[in-house]
Amino acid sequence: TENIDALSDDGKNGITIIAFIGSVFSPYYALARRNGPADPLNHCAINVAVYAKDSKRWAMTERPSSAVSRTSNSFTVGPSNLSWDGKALTIRIDEITAPIPRRLRGTIRAVPTVITQQAFTLNESGNHQWWPIAPCARVQVALVLPHLRWQGDGYFDMNRGDAPLESGFSDWQWSRGATRDGAAILYEALRRDGGRVDLAMTFDPRGRMQTFEPPVLHTLKRTGWRIGREVRSEDAPSVLRTLEDAPFYARSTISAKLLDEPVILMHESLSLDRFRMPIVQSMLPFRMPRARR
């Protein structure tokens, strides 16, 4: 998966885009794997979540391999695609939202200050990796439907794995925020083998990384779906806005303090124990429909 996150300079808008090859959250892919190995290209989607001041829109339509094409610098799923020109990542979106069908169309452009080279292995078996491709980027959003234009601070990364996410991890907490000198990222996960992922790092605009000792862990108020949220901060953090509240997943903006500096974090919480519950699996098609082409 490739993930793009951004917040507008005025703090009123946000966007998340995730390009999936073999969607880790797909109920159709999970069903196909019950009978043996399944082709990940037959389960692709471009997930778009738009967080405007007074509204939200979500689209995540899965499509078969016949609707997918990719090259060394582009990835197309149905009517939407991502392309890289050597300087910027451009995402052209033409999707239908769910569960209420509305058109979501427009262009997003992410311009990184630098591309990093280091990926991180997240478990002992080595079948899950994370690469913070562009810790610092400027993002321009130009949506036609809904009509929305803004620019702001952003980021993109990549997760790669050859095993189901829920088989390797039970809980996942990730956050990233812009700092005066670049960006700070916190990545924590509880593995099924009892081990932990604990990453705390900063990046400057030239891509130079430094690790730091993460501050104390704070437990935040649970979401409406009772998803737990935890974040590290040098003083008491606060939830500014719950952007996404789903049965197994939450995305929030959080005010915190890292390295003696106040930061606004884009934060995600993922409960994989909750995700694999049968009742949750039965809900997924309502937000993640599958198209025939």
Language-model features: where?
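Structured soluble/peripheral alpha/beta segments that form catalytic or ligand/cofactor-binding pockets
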Residues: 1-293
